[in-house]
Amino acid sequence: ISSHDSFKVLRLPYSNGQDARSFSMYIILPNEKAGLFALEKGLTVDILEKTLVKGVEVDVGTFKLPKFKVSAGYEVPDTLKEMGMKLPFSDEADFSGMVDSSSNGGHALSISNVFHKTFIEVNEEGTEAAAATAGVVVLRSFVLRSSEDFIADHPFMFVLKEDITGIIVFMGHVVNPLSTS
């Protein structure tokens, strides 16, 4: 647990077994019960990078985190085109190496749309993200120095991050853990 001016962060490292990657879920809990909006508004990439680092490990006293499920879906062709991926969406696209043209009457193919859907579910068994189980949360043992309570009884943010590369895989917030959107 690391404490900051207006929030605290709990890092939950995942057991990685044989995997060389190192994933952690970070729960960012505002000190104020109604402080999530202000926290998100003031959050920058620089603050996130400084906040989501392995800090001093302490024993967690009382730990309460509600079960939650968050999902989102959207169409992404405009975003892909803005990133320079225009050819697959055009009449000049050539998918002949992937699709037998006799199966589609010899017509040329192009991509008309791309849908992206993500979800993350956290419960007492662990975390499931993007239809693949990421692992089970395991608090590793460490030297007893102090104990701090972490009770997420009000809106909070979560970040799922690969710790070696620093890549953020998922990020979202929970306002009402009973809602699935």
What residue ranges belong to the model's regions?
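Secretory/exported precursors with cleavable N-terminal leaders
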Residues: 1-181
